[in-house]
């Protein structure tokens, strides 16, 4: 299931990215690297960030370059200095865990190439409420999202939503795609 989802996610990201092979692909909270594997198999340079040292070791053993660190603007600046900006950044179901959500997003904005694409997957609060999914509310989730608040948060750091996709993960999630340039409506 995760492997199928990772392939679909890969294809959706590539469709939305120009010059995707330039620079590198960054996943925040990359776990064992499952969602970076399709990029690796297709010749992309990838970097995963995950705070769990044991999981980062597994990812590296599976061919996914992974740093065992928490994501924040300090990590972003260090990575930017070493590797330059990322062409693609994605963070799946991790934003709700961030203690300092503004610093987390600031780090993504700092690390994203000027022509890059950011994809953030979050459990959608609308799905939780509509489906009465009270069992989806966890103590480690510090927030839940609808589109407007996440869009406002991204805008504060010069990131602009250009597409949204529904995901069936966790009983209903949204994937928000953003860029540094505001796309004018026609």
Residue ranges of each PLM-predicted region?
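Conserved SAM-binding strand-loop segment of SAM-dependent methyltransferases
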Residues: 63-78
């Amino acid at each position: 299931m995760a492997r199928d989802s990772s392939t679909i996610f890969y294809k959706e990201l590539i469709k939305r990215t120009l010059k995707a092979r330039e620079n590198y692909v960054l996943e925040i909270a990359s776990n064992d690297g499952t969602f970076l594997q399709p990029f690796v198999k297709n010749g992309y340079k990838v970097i995963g960030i995950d705070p769990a040292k044991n999981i980062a070791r597994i990812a590296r053993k599976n061919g996914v370059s992974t740093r065992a660190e928490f994501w924040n603007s300090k990590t972003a600046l260090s990575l930017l200095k070493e590797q330059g900006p990322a062409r693609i950044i994605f963070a799946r179901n991790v934003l709700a865990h961030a203690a300092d959500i503004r610093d987390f997003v600031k780090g993504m904005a700092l690390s994203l190439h000027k022509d890059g694409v950011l994809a953030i997957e979050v459990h959608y609060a609308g799905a939780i409420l509509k489906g009465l999914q009270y069992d989806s509310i966890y103590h480690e989730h510090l927030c839940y999202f609808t589109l407007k608040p996440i869009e406002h948060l991204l805008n504060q750091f010069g990131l602009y939503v250009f597409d949204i996709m529904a995901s069936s993960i966790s009983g209903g999630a949204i994937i928000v795609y953003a860029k540094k340039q505001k796309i004018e409506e026609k």
